[in-house]
Each structure stands twice: as structure tokens, then as C-alpha cells.
């Protein structure tokens, strides 16, 4: 997609919020509506060409007594997901009665397969339907998202002569657009934690290069597992997947890549899973898990070949103590953070309660492979405090000692802090 078309699309989506939500929602709440509708319309546009075939197959399968329809109809749709309702968003645009529109829109949402329901539920969009309907904004919102001047499909819109009228929105550009819209909402509302789930594309590319280029000659025709324990919208996993496949092709190798991530924020988790689904990666979408990596590790005892991450920093992790059912960090017994080292069976890697980033690093180290030639590579973004915080014998000091004594650190690279959005404008960052 050329830059002009991309910019027009971004501006149009941003304008939908101002056109549809003014006087109904505060500016800070626009994202609660626009982001899920953006995702839903993307799914809708991808499924649209096969909609009639799906409806026909649904009738045939139902008549034949088949009750588990999701997988069968997804195959008809040629996607990893499906919508079993009788409607598309374009169909709903013609509704003039608000009550009928509301009823049909709910039925439309309910028609999505279970792997999309997980996403819709985390966006909490159903909680907003009554309000949108009562304010006569639901129909306007749908009308804007199906406007023929924009194309959220993965296929181009053609003129009568077959020439391209509006370019397709490919999966990579869709992911970038997601991030751009999120960033715009954050900046508009002065949200200060944008970097919690928005890592600049240049930094993501750098992280992927550091992960794969130094070992490109060792890449074999085999399966590799990539993990991000603070995956946000899934950008690092996506770019990592692209980079290693590109390098493998250049080396004449055929690789199979499996992606794994964990995220504890509803909205970004929903976006990460949505991004996987629209790429046709249904199984990969199931490997994006919800919950706190610190206290609810969804990949316990698993090992990975590459671990790429930009974990949160400077955010207290007291809620994890509560999740563990304990009151003090000294009571933690998780073997990712309390290890047997240097004749000490309770060697602690646990930092102060106010900053979790070292816990994410310890978590990654616990998932390193030790029985393969390549082993594991960890590329993780930290702020400068990870280099010096904690007195001798403290968790951070112990973790640094362990890393260097075990010869696990290949490089520490300083990166310009102003590449980041508002969360890191005054913080030094480094890539380990």
C-alpha cells in the first residue's frame, strides 16, 4: 500500500471517532469503540467474499445433523475463523429501525466462531451496544466502517475495467495501522504508558535483526519456537516470524515457525489474537495466552529458541503477590525466580516490588534451551536501571551476576530514548 493511501486510511479511521462519538463518549473512551469495530470490520471484510457460501453450507450441515459448525464453516470460508450469522456489516447498514439494528448486530457478533468470541469479549464491545443504540450512533458507526471510500479487506477494490481502485490492506500493513491508531489515541488523551504495548517499528526490526542475523548460518530446515512474555499487540512475534523466514529462504532452508505470547491487558491481548487470525494463523492465535507472565505463567517448563520482549518497567507488581496468595516477595517460591546456584538453594533473582522488568528477564532465562547446538537467544529491552539497581546480594545484583558468570550476555546496546513514545521520553533504554 502506498503512503498516500495509508495516510488517508489512517485519517479516515481517526475521523470516525470524531464523527460518531462526540457528545456521547469522552475523548479518552473513543478507543473502546473504534478499536473493536476496526477489528470486527477487518474480519467482516476478509470473510465477505465467502459469506453466501458459508450460509449455504450452514443450512446443509445443519440439515445433516452437524452441530459443531465452527471448523467446518471456517474451511468453507477459507479462513481460520468464520461468522455463522445471516448478516454482514454491509447488510446491517441498511437497517433504519434502531431496535432491529441492535438485535441484528448482537446476532451478528454472536455468529463469530469461538476464536473470535475470545477477542470480542476482551474488547468488551457488547457493554457499549445499548449506549450506542440509544444515542443513534450504532448505525452511523457501521456506515462509516463500510464506507466504500476505504478498504479494510485483504483484496483490492477494482474498477469496472479491472484496474485497482483501492489497494488491498495486507496483514503487515494492518498490524502497523493498528499500532498507529493506538498511538494516536494515546497521544490525544495524554496516556503515558503507550510504550507498554507500543514498541516503535524501528526498534522491533532491530530486535529481530539482533536475534537472527548473528546465527543465520546456523539456521537449519527445522522447527523454531519464538516467545514474547509481554507480547502486547504481537508486533515482535510477527516481525520475528518474517525475519527468520526471510533469512532461512536466503540460506536455502525451509523452516516451520511457531509463535507464543502472553499478555495481561484485555485490549492489547485482543489485538494480538486478532492479528494472528486475520493472517490465517488460527493455531498460532491459540498460543497467545491471557494472564500475568509473572504470577500465571502459561508456558511453564516450556523452552523456546528465540525470546524477544519489551517488558513493562517501573510498574508495581503487587497484584502478582496477591495472585500467588502471599503478602511479601520473600515468600515467593517460583523456581524461575528462586534458583539453586553457587551452593545456595534459595538464590533470589527477585527485584523490588516497584519494577518487574528483571522478572521478565529471569522468566526468559528459565525457558532457554541447553541441549541444542543453537541454544536460545534472548533479546530484551530494558531501561537503564537494570544495569545498576540493587545492592550486592539483592535480586537484580544476583541476576546480573548469574548472567555474566554463566556467559549468557553477548551484548548490551544503547538505543536513543526519543525513538519511543511518551512513556520513555526521559528514560534511557538498552537492548540486552
Protein language model features and the residues they cover:
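Conserved S-adenosyl-L-methionine
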Residues: 196-309, 313-327, 383-385, 392-399, ...
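Non-catalytic, mostly N-terminal accessory regions of nucleic-acid modification and defense proteins
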Residues: 1-215, 284-293, 414-418
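Conserved Class I SAM-dependent methyltransferase catalytic core
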Residues: 30, 34-39, 346-419
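N-terminal low-complexity segments that are often proline-rich with Ser/Thr-Pro
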Residues: 428-432
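Glycine- and acidic
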Residues: 18-21, 163, 188-194, 224-226, ...
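Mobile active-site "lid"/loop adjacent to the S-adenosyl-L-methionine
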Residues: 314-356, 379-390
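Conserved small/polar residues in nucleotide/adenosyl-binding loops
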Residues: 420-427
